[in-house]
């Protein structure tokens, strides 16, 4: 701006009346004229002005003179035309003037956009090269920057490679996709009004994929197998809006049609879990936004290959969201043969009885302090298999209870721990024939328990019939036992402990006191009330 302001000011100064009339007014008398007229036509001082340096001219309608008018500083070299110099190429006066006086016409660029050569309205000089664009002459259009070669506007024009509005230049071969004629290389896709390429600001599609919204087949290719939209029948293969392509092969494992049975067993009865948005006429592919399926099982339940909306691909052998069953177990329809459904006998592990001591609890023997069973012929009795409630494998030597009274087998009711072999429980459940290894006493045939079923049962051992010097057969058996705990327990038994009168054929042992019949005690054997063995 500074370079152009100084010539403009000089031009305005030179247009004053004094300059147009031949220079400055006459000097007062007494002042000599040294070099000639002061009108700018001669060389020298005029009116006390310093002499000008040669080579400078006044350029606004004046002749070429080596001085300045009105005390102005000389111009720098290189601007406009010099005195006697030929026309400078590429520079004009910039104000519509054709040429300077004396100097010849200025040669330079051809006319641009209706302007003469030079600057148009304070703009910078144009660079040569651009061709005519959009009906304009080469150069600037208003304040717009020059266009790059090869690009043209595409709004309202034929589809040509270049800009569309404010968009970046398209790659060759792509159309604008907004009703303009399509470019060669790609044909129209998906029965849309768009040409191949970009639609609006959308990126161009890759070859081979369609919109899948009731679109036609791909150009140059037949119907793509295993691809579909899934939103209605008759949908052509392709991609659903914003969806990834399907991988072929996987069927919808939703329990319809032939396929997996219950618990992943082929051929079994089918359950039909509810799967959202799975219709019988849906074509293969995704419903909604789903990941691609992995190839695998064939189509099931009348559907084509694909998966339900929001569901991950199923693994072979699964139905819906059910996990595969382990071998031997069924699913929701009763147990299959296995160790926990009472169809297979549980595993029996024999164990040895552990010695114990009498308990202070009522009944003679508690649940945690039972002595081992008696020894027969120097051997332990064989264990008997049994199970209790809960269907867990039972320990060897127990059987489930089957009732009360006579004939009750060893074991307990539900919730009770099993008894160790060799003793009764003392609650009236077990009778004289409790243990298979114990033999009835002579004279105790058909014994069926105690009176009121709440007494303490006398131990029944094979050697119980042997007479003891103290007159107590049970104490003698305990003293002669091989177990120290039984010997100590037998020593505490008092004479006169016999079976009560509930035994029909009961009679006193030889050498012992008579049995007291009709006693008020629960045992009817001389003991009144409940009394543990040897502790009354």
Swiss-Prot record:
Residue ranges, annotated region (Disordered): 111-134, 306-336, 500-536
Keyword list, A-Z: Signal
Ranges of Gly residues composition bias in the record: 115-124, 521-536
Top-level division of the source organism's lineage: Eukaryota
Transmembrane segments annotated in the record for this chain: none
Signal sequence annotation: 1-22
The protein's name: Glycine-rich extracellular protein 1
Organism: Homo sapiens
């Amino acid at each position: 701006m500074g370079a152009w302001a100084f010539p403009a000011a000089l031009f305005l100064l030179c247009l004053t009346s004094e300059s147009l009339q031949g220079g400055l007014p006459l000097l007062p008398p007494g002042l000599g004229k040294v070099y000639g007229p002061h009108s700018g036509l001669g060389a020298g001082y005029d009116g006390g002005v310093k002499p000008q340096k040669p080579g400078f001219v006044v350029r606004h309608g004046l002749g070429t003179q080596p001085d300045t008018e009105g005390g102005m500083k000389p111009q720098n070299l290189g601007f406009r035309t010099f005195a006697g110099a030929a026309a400078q190429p590429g520079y004009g006066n910039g104000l519509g003037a054709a040429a300077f006086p004396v100097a010849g016409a200025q040669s330079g660029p051809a006319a641009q956009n209706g302007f003469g050569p030079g600057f148009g309205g304070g703009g910078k000089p144009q660079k040569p090269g651009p061709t005519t664009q959009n009906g304009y002459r080469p150069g600037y259009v208003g304040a717009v920057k020059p266009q790059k070669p090869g690009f043209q506007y595409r709004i309202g024009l034929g589809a040509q490679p270049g800009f569309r509005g404010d968009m970046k230049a398209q790659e060759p071969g792509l159309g604008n996709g907004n009703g303009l004629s399509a470019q060669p290389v790609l044909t129209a896709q998906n029965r849309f009004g768009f040409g191949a390429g970009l639609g609006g600001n959308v990126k161009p599609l890759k070859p081979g994929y369609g919109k899948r919204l009731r679109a036609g087949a791909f150009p140059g290719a037949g119907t793509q197998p295993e691809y579909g939209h899934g939103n209605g029948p008759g949908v052509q293969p392709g991609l659903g809006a914003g969806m990834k392509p399907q991988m072929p092969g996987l069927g919808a494992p939703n329990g319809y049609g032939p396929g997996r049975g219950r618990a992943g067993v082929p051929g079994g009865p089918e359950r039909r879990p509810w799967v959202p948005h799975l219709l019988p006429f849906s074509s293969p592919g995704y419903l909604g936004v789903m990941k691609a399926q992995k190839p695998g099982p064939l189509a099931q339940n009348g559907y084509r290959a694909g998966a339900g909306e929001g569901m991950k691909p199923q693994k072979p052998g699964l139905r819906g969201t059910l996990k595969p069953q382990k071998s031997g177990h069924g699913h929701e329809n009763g147990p299959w043969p296995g160790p926990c459904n009472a169809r297979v006998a549980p595993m029996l592990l024999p164990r040895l009885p552990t010695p114990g001591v009498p308990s202070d609890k009522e009944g003679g023997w508690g649940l945690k302090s039972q002595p081992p069973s008696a020894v027969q012929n120097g051997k332990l009795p064989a264990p008997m298999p049994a199970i209790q409630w809960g269907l867990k494998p039972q320990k060897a030597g127990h059987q489930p209870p089957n009732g009360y009274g006579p004939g009750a087998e060893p074991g307990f009711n539900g919730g009770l721990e099993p008894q160790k072999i060799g003793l009764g429980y003392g609650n009236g459940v077990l009778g004289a024939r409790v243990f298979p290894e114990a033999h009835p006493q002579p004279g105790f045939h058909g014994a069926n328990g105690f009176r009121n079923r709440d007494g303490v049962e006398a131990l029944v051992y094979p050697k119980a019939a042997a007479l003891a010097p103290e007159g107590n057969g049970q104490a003698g058996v305990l003293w002669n036992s091989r177990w120290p705990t039984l010997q100590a327990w037998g020593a505490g038994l008092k004479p006169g402990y016999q079976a009560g009168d509930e035994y029909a054929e009961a009679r006193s042992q030889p050498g012992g006191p008579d049995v007291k019949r009709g006693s008020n005690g629960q045992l009817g054997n001389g003991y009144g009330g409940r009394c543990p063995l040897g502790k009354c």
